[in-house]
């Protein structure tokens, strides 16, 4: 059972976010600073022990945010788990390789790029000064971040060093750096050359353009019910779509899945629950998120409900960390379409448990779940062999 305070504490309004400009060693490099680093779910890979974190609870993945002025660059670095960039505002040039050549691809609002582990990557703001990307990192323990040799050299030239135990030593702030300290050894050119090379054509398969999303109006059991009408578009991994022909453009393991959900004005997603933890980021519109405190069975009436309103606009995007296995529903509280990004823990397919009254109402509309957990015509499903 959840308390009202527990439920409310998981709401992350955009205006509550706090950043640091000194999360990483590149803060001292002029072309890389300022860079505003946010940690929403988990600490991410920040090398600053004072990094503000909105919610430290483990989810199986981590959610962060990044913003920096036009023309600023995040230099070459590498991760050991998935890193997903979700562009919510502006235009960005994504870079990868540094092996030694650099490949680039531009992304815009609503686009998602997932960069494979064990390759160097960076990015540059080529749009508005307040451009913003959310980020998803695979796993609770990511293994940290490994900077490219050129990044460590540029920082050292500014008097800022990274020790082999990942402590930042800033001589400009009066900290001492001497021969007794051991600097982090970067990869050698030979080691970098041994990393996999991803061509622009290969990386393009890992960019999911917002304009090319595969929306389905049959992805949820309740979609055809009066006052519902939600559509779902998969991005990566096995999500909660109940459309049997849905397949995400990116299918390899990340530790989480990503989908978009679109609610028409006045629409909703009816009462349901998932076994997995899920993070919702409101991209556009006003969405009421209703969460129940009691973990009752599907036949029970709704229990005590906490209602939160999440808003998404070019000025900011509210988030909510949905607890596992709790009853919830989503309602479009605005007079325009609402868009929400869903990040759900786990590589396995997610299975929705619908409230009993939703299942009955769907049956009246000749909709039911087949033996494989997909939406189909009830009059056929009822004829299936026991």
Question: For the regions a protein language model found, what residue spans apply to each?
Answer:
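A short, N-terminal "cap"/entry segment at the start of jelly-roll beta-barrel domains
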Residues: 1-59, 163-254, 374-386
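Conserved short histidine dyad/triad with adjacent acidic residue
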Residues: 44-51, 62-79, 257-275, 293-296, ...
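Short histidine-centered beta-strand/loop micro-motifs
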Residues: 51-56, 74-79, 96, 104-105, ...
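Glycine- and acidic-residue-biased ligand/ion/polar-headgroup-sensing regions
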Residues: 70, 80-98, 265, 275-297
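Histidine-centered metal-chelating micro-motifs
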Residues: 73-75, 93, 100, 112-113, ...
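Short acidic-glycine-tyrosine-enriched beta hairpin
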Residues: 98-116, 293-324
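Double-stranded beta-helix
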Residues: 122-196, 327-386
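Long compositionally biased, domain-poor regions of proteins
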Residues: 263, 269, 281-284, 288-311, ...
């Amino acid at each position: 059972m959840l308390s009202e305070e527990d439920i409310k504490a998981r709401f992350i309004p955009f205006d509550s976010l706090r950043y640091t400009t000194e999360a990483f060693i590149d803060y001292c490099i002029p072309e890389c600073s300022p860079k505003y680093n946010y940690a929403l779910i988990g600490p991410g890979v920040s090398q600053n022990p004072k990094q503000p974190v909105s919610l430290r609870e483990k989810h199986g993945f981590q959610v962060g945010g990044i913003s920096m002025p036009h023309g600023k660059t995040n230099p070459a670095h590498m991760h050991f788990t998935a890193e997903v960039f979700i562009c919510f505002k502006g235009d960005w040039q994504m870079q990868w390789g540094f092996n030694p050549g650099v490949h680039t691809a531009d992304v815009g609002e609503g686009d998602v790029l997932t960069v494979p582990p064990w390759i160097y990557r960076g990015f540059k703001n080529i749009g508005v000064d307040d451009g913003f990307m959310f980020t998803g990192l695979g796993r609770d323990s990511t293994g940290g971040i490994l900077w490219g040799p050129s990044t460590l050299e540029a920082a050292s030239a500014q008097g800022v060093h990274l020790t082999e135990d990942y402590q930042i030593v800033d001589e400009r702030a009066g900290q001492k750096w001497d021969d007794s300290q051991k600097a982090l050894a970067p990869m050698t050119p030979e080691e970098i050359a041994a990393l996999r090379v991803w061509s622009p054509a290969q990386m393009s398969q890992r960019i999911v353009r917002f304009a090319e999303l595969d929306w389905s109006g049959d992805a949820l059991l309740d979609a055809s019910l009066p006052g519902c009408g939600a559509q779902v578009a998969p991005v990566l991994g096995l999500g909660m779509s109940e459309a049997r022909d849905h397949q995400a453009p990116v299918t390899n393991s990340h530790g989480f899945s990503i989908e978009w959900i679109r609610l028409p004005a006045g629409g909703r997603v009816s009462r349901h629950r998932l076994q997995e933890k899920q993070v919702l980021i409101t991209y556009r519109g006003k969405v009421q998120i209703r969460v129940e405190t009691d973990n009752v069975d599907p036949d029970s009436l709704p229990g005590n409900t906490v209602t939160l309103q999440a808003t998404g606009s070019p000025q900011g995007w509210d988030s909510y960390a949905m607890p596992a296995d709790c009853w919830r529903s989503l309602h479009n509280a605005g007079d325009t379409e609402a868009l929400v990004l869903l990040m759900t823990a786990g590589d396995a397919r997610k299975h929705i448990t619908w409230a009993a009254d939703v299942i009955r109402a769907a049956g009246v509309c000749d909709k039911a779940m087949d033996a494989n957990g997909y939406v189909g015509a009830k009059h056929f499903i009822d004829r299936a062999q026991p």
